[in-house]
Amino acid sequence: MLKVTTSRPWVCSRCVRRQVQSRRRLATASTQYRESRPVPVDNSAPGAKRDDRTLRQIFDSPNFWAEFSQSSKQSYNRPAVGLFQNRYLVNPQGFEVFANTSLRKAQRIVDKVLSASTVEEYRHVARELDRLSDLLCRVIDLSDFVRATHPNAAIQAAASRAYAKMFEYMNILNTTTGLDKQLEIAMATPEIVAGWTEEEVVVADILRKDFAKSAIDLPRAQRERFVALSQEISEIGPEFVDYMTPAKPYLTFESSKLKGMDPVLVRQYTTWGQTKIPTIGGAAAAAIRSVQNEDVRKEIFMATRTASRNTVYKLEELMRKRAELAKLSRYESYSHLALGDKMAKSPASVSQFLEALSKDNNQIVEGEVSELLKFKMSNSHGSSPGLQPWDKDYYMSQILASVRSHSRNSDFLSAYFSLGTVMQGLSRLFTRLYGVRLAPHETMPGETWNSDVRRLDVISETDGHVAVLYCDLFSRPGKSPNPAHFTLRCSREITTPELEEASSLSQNGLFKTNEEAANDGMATSRASGVLKQLPTIALICDFVTMSGKSSRPALLSFNEVQTLFHEMGHAIHSILGRTSLQNVSGTRCATDFAELPSVLMEHFAADPSVLSLFARHYETDQPLPYEMVAEKLALDKRFEGSDTENQIILSMLDLAYHSDLPLSPSFSSTQIYHSLQQKHGALPVDPPGTCWQGFFGHLFGYGSTYYSYLFDRVLARRIWQVVFKDGEAGGSIQRDNGEKMKEEVLKWGGGRDPWKCLAGVLDDGRVENGDEKAMAIVGSWGVKE
């Protein structure tokens, strides 16, 4: 089965999770204050000093950016070069030309693979199928991004049509027998496999497993049922996510009963003394955290935790169809189908990990519950005994407010984090760890989708130009508020036959050279004599700028700094994971390994040595006093055990729903959820009558892999401790440590067993086999600092 990059269940769980539930941020560094002197900047590489200075200015100085971007447009004096320098995409019609050209190339590859009959021809099957995947991704990934991001409706529509055309072709390939048989023949011939590179072996194995999942070898009737089920799942899943509703959409109270809630917020929902609060959204969450009247809090809590009957029905129908699909594909359950190519390998291993993590976390949560109960007993009169489910968020909020009142205002922190200095800091950090830096690059006419977009070239000390990063970081009307990292084109080696094929395109005047034609005009590099298409990445954030003619730069909150570091963790994985084959490049690795580099970067964002590289007051240029960060981290970590418990239970729930239980006539998603809370939780259990699982939208996107973010939190914390020495003695900015991470983890993308990557970077052979024992060991490491 051929897959595109965007088909991964999620790109960035850190940001996506905020859409469904409010979650306390994980503090990712020790809060103990460590004094750190400013670290000198390494500007030894040619042009590095200029790039370092310019990097800050293009984000922090509107005047400098206006001059920088305007001069680039004037200097080229030429027509539009196309989005991302893709020469086809100079106008809406170009998307159809791009799709049709790619489609013809893909069809030639399919014919070539299907007609293979000699050893020499079979030797190329793995690489040809990888190129086929790349051709699909070139159109689908880029078009998917453009249709969601570009402000021009005509271009959006053209991108959508190109996306649909290639996606339809991909589905045809995935239900057509022949490609899988040819791959099987190649893999079963020792003479052929012996001549393959390590990457070719890995890619062939990935494709073989994917073909098996697609039921392509089933009898015709069963295969048709598989296709029908897949279509039904693709329809009911989005319906469940997009149209989930509460049983009671609104609750009405006399405004006098909402004492404690922000009066400004209350007035927004009040008419003639009656306050009508929507039960889903920020207002209800704020009420549960702040309303003093326990009966009111209880009523709101019950409503926010009770999905409509139709929503729960859609959820259970989705689970039943997935269970049937798995059985049809000869798997014990959908979890077995989904986890076979993940680090976990099986549901049993995930359970081992979650139970070990739960055991490690349980004592922490019990302490937090005890603190909440003690606070309730000393600050309430006549309320219900014990800690009730509707008490938790309220008393957490009360405790945090009392702590916050004795600390510095966290708003002061943002003065030390102008966007330009943070980008400068990321570049300096990457230079120290990995020998790559971010270099501002003037864009050509038509290259970007908005005038606010900055292009950064990634420059390596040893390999020169290695990636292109488009940064769309400022807020504007109509733009999605959710931060994200998009891989628009993956790394891949371009072969000599491809250059020969491209000669016909370069002769029509659209491209100047065969090399340009082979990659549609987008960035390439010929380091070490090998031509490669370079990773092309888009980074989207929604940072607020000052309105009008203010010269003040965009100032980030500390949470926004962590978010930017997180997203750049995905980017550095794409940048350093420049493999020869597309299927294993960068972030195209096991789902439960993909978040590791990004979560690890959150640790760097809170480290004194890293912050000393860049965090300075935007007006006075004074360095950041680290105790301000330490206070913020201590506050964020106050109840992290409770958050971890919730994530553990949701991960267990995801696993249970994707077992064979949905095929039972007595399947009840509510009973399963409440039973898991009772068995594994120390926090108050949801009351009878509630059915919160109807709001668990990630069940569709994650499908047995919700544990992944917890898993990667544990891995990231362990690597931070072992490899980067918890940041002690400058361990967070030492090249040797960065090289260890790059050589053992990042450079492989998905081309190496992630358990071998983990064992190598930690020098811990106990986990190399990746069995249930290894999962239990990882779970025992825990997430608590």
From Swiss-Prot:
Supply the EC number(s).
Answer: 3.4.24.59
- Which species is listed as the source? Botryotinia fuckeliana (strain B05.10) (Noble rot fungus)
One cellular-component annotation, GO:
mitochondrial matrix
Keywords for the protein's UniProt record, in alphabetical order: Hydrolase, Metal-binding, Metalloprotease, Mitochondrion, Protease, Transit peptide, Zinc
Chain residue ranges for the region called Disordered: 26-51
Q: Which cofactors?
A: Zn(2+)
Gene Ontology biological-process annotations: peptide metabolic process; protein processing involved in protein targeting to mitochondrion
Protein name (record):
Mitochondrial intermediate peptidase
Q: Which residues bind Zn(2+)?
A: 566, 570, 573
The cofactor note from the UniProt entry for this protein is: Binds 1 zinc ion.
Q: Which GO terms describe its molecular function?
A: metal ion binding; metalloendopeptidase activity
